[in-house]
């Protein structure tokens, strides 16, 4: 990880605090993982404040596979089975079956429809009947211990929401370059500068939690 590129966003703790402040005000953050892991950066928004314009940005600027990060108890409450019984993904990414809101959507693929699906899944009264499958939103189940258990974007997303005092649900999508290749840290920083966002890393979040005993 090129720490020099990250210095403009502050120290390890400052980057996390800035990210939390952004999420509390409905803004997005960019989270990078290690170069020896996925070596990717994800654009992340709080699920409870997500807007169609923010969803459209994710669809336009990112991979298009918009994921809803959920803690295990919410996955269970919604009755979502895992996508496969035996996960052979290199990173062990815990996809459930994809979802669509049962009501209030058309084809489910538009930005507004995907936001509606996210809202249906995180509603306080949400139940299995509130959703249909398959759909155009891809839930991910976070490990219970967060980034201290698994250093993935899924866990970082849920941890950030909890630390920000928000509902523990977040939406992410991998940032891509205009040619379709994956954005690495230099491109992530450039995107952040152009869109007035902050960048932090999964390792920042690990250190923050460990230092504060969270």
Swiss-Prot record:
Cofactor(s) it depends on: Mg(2+); Mn(2+)
Gene3D superfamilies in UniProt: DHBP synthase (3.90.870.10)
Disulfide bond entries: none
GO cellular component, one term: cytosol
Pathway of action: Cofactor biosynthesis; riboflavin biosynthesis; 2-hydroxy-3-oxobutyl phosphate from D-ribulose 5-phosphate: step 1/1
Reaction(s) this enzyme catalyzes, per UniProt: D-ribulose 5-phosphate = (2S)-2-hydroxy-3-oxobutyl phosphate + formate + H(+)
Record keywords, A-Z: Lyase, Magnesium, Manganese, Metal-binding, Riboflavin biosynthesis
Transmembrane segments: none
GO molecular function, one term: 3,4-dihydroxy-2-butanone-4-phosphate synthase activity
Positions bound to Mg(2+) 1: 38
Positions of the record's site feature: Essential for catalytic activity: 136, 174
Co-factor binding details: Binds 2 divalent metal cations per subunit. Magnesium or manganese.
Documented EC number(s): 4.1.99.12
Biological process annotations from GO: riboflavin biosynthetic process
Pfam families, per database record: DHBP_synthase
Residues engaged in binding D-ribulose 5-phosphate: 37-38, 42, 150-154, 174
Cited function: Catalyzes the conversion of D-ribulose 5-phosphate to formate and 3,4-dihydroxy-2-butanone 4-phosphate.
Assembly description: Homodimer.
PANTHER family with a match to the protein in the record: 3,4-DIHYDROXY-2-BUTANONE 4-PHOSPHATE SYNTHASE, GTP CYCLOHYDROLASE II-RELATED
Entry similarity comment: Belongs to the DHBP synthase family.
UniProt-recorded name of the protein: 3,4-dihydroxy-2-butanone 4-phosphate synthase
Species the sequence originates in: Nitratidesulfovibrio vulgaris (strain DP4)
